[in-house]
Amino acid sequence: MHVILYQDNSVPVVKVEVMYGVGSKDDPARKTGFAHFFEHLLFEGTANIERGEWFKIVSANGGRNNAYTTYDLTTYFEIFPSNQLELGLWMESERLLHPVINQIGVETQNGVIKEERRQTQDNRPYGNLISEVTRHLFPGTGYYHSIIGSIEDLDNATLEDFLNFHKTFYMPNNAVLVVAGDFKKDQAKRWIQQYFGPIPKGESIMRAPFVSHPITEQINAKFEDANIQTPMMVLAYKTPPADSREAMVLDFISSILSDGKSSRLSKKMVDDKKMALFIGAFNYALKNSGMYLIYGLPMGDFTMDDLVREVDEEIKKLQNELITEREYQKLMNQYENNFVQSNSTPEGIATSLATNFTMFGNANRINTELETYRSIKPEEIREVARKYLNPNQRLYLQYVPESPKPAPVVEEPAPVIEEPKVETPNAMDPKKKPKKVKKPKKSKKK
């Protein structure tokens, strides 16, 4: 396990973060959603932390915690008062070494994830946007499906399937531990050795090579969403992976086109011509590839095709003309400000360090990232726009309201059926105190 310590004693707070090099791209075939499932499942308890007690322990000790999954990684963290560092390290070592993975936990989290999918994807306006884009851009790869995966796949999965997935990816040699904030380095090192040292590093992970073919002709697609009333125009281009300098140039292009009211697309299409209710662009860099999205909501009598024509016109300008000095200085100021904000606290620095190690194999990238952005010249912006943002290299997705369905023919009145009421028991009774936790053993003084 790679360990990173970042000491900042200005505030009596410490963050313990463990990031694993497993994301939804690593989900097995016909078992989509496994990585995200484990984001939930590994809070179910351990051999020494009873089921349902994890969040209570953290809260009772003045802390907070969370976890998230992306296409490429999964991370867990606790933020505690600095005098609870040992507790945070012990809990994360428990998650790694002694997780309880059983049928009741799987069934419980399956229900939780079904509700999460309904809220964030299926019943949310434009909730299937990203999954529709990846389905067309990355067929046959781990990026083709949504992070949350298929409910059918999760329903069909067995306990053995989950155990095998855990055995493959959740081990020290696929993880990085970051401790950031107020702590004493020597003491932190002793605790890390005590709690993580005995854990077997695990076997090497055999990953299939990533193969994705370039787009040579515009892909035209349509998706109907019952949750929307206004159609959305979406243009998506396949772009280079996150470790490419060109991916950073594409970040700049996003800002030029749509970051703020004075950006090119926003000023032209929203303010001046009043063609769009909204227009946006962003670069989504992944470990093995990337995607660049431009999306907008047409206004009034304007159509999605009208928006596409205006977007193409602005991209042509980027491909043929250098940006102005004023735009260039605005970019520099924006990215310096963004970098400072993201890394202004030990908590933010911890995530940056863990992400840089997991995505790029180089935690020190945090010290060079801003300088790399500063070194990008207007000529590079023009060349990258020419290379990646062409009509024959993209998906044109028309994301539209669901077509009205014909009314069913009813020959006789349908019976009136009362909907049964189901009261969900309160899983977090405020009167119930957390059970006594077995304290971590104190390390012996040498």
Q: What is each model feature region?
A:
Residues 1-3, 184-224, 267, 368-446:
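Proteolytic maturation boundary segments
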Residues 6, 11-27, 33-37, 51-95, ...:
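M16 family metallopeptidases and their MPP-like homologs
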Residues 32-46:
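Active-site SXXK
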Residues 44-48, 96-104, 323-324:
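Short, polar/flexible loop-turn hinges at active-site or ligand-entry regions and domain interfaces
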Residues 53, 98-107, 157:
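Peptidyl-prolyl cis-trans isomerase
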Residues 110, 159, 163-195, 393:
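Non-catalytic, conformational "gating/processing" segments within enzyme and secreted inhibitor domains
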Residues 118, 135, 204-262, 295:
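His/Glu-based metal-binding/catalytic segments typifying zinc-dependent metallopeptidases
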